[in-house]
């Protein structure tokens, strides 16, 4: 009698452990998504830092909120909340001499990747730092965040 209950308990425990444990393929997928996010952020930063960008000084006047602490994928919620202001600043800066190709597509790609990485259940309330960041600082910090998470996955 007790043997059957014990075996059932063991079977359920094993099923729970195997279904909730991250697999190497999910880790690999996460790493690839982070690498794509990293490339998109770097592409925006490179476009902004382009020596031909006459509107860089204007772009630097816009401020972005940064989380106090960004160490886990759930903190990508804070990046997601700043995507619309980022897109607006990038659109304002478009000119004949400076044009980031497909700004809307880049922001859309970033948004999709962020949603997949942080998970749909995330309802994290971002705790923002007291100081704001320029667009360059903002992008650099999120690039560093991606690099740091990628390094923990490899």
UniProtKB/Swiss-Prot annotation:
It comes from the Eukaryota. It is found in: Secreted. Keywords: Adaptive immunity, Cytokine, Disulfide bond, Glycoprotein, Growth factor, Immunity, Secreted, Signal. GO terms for biological process: adaptive immune response. GO terms for cellular component: extracellular space. Glycans are attached at residue 23. Belongs to the IL-2 family. This is Interleukin-2. It comes from Papio anubis. The lineage of its organism: Eukaryota, Metazoa, Chordata, Craniata, Vertebrata.
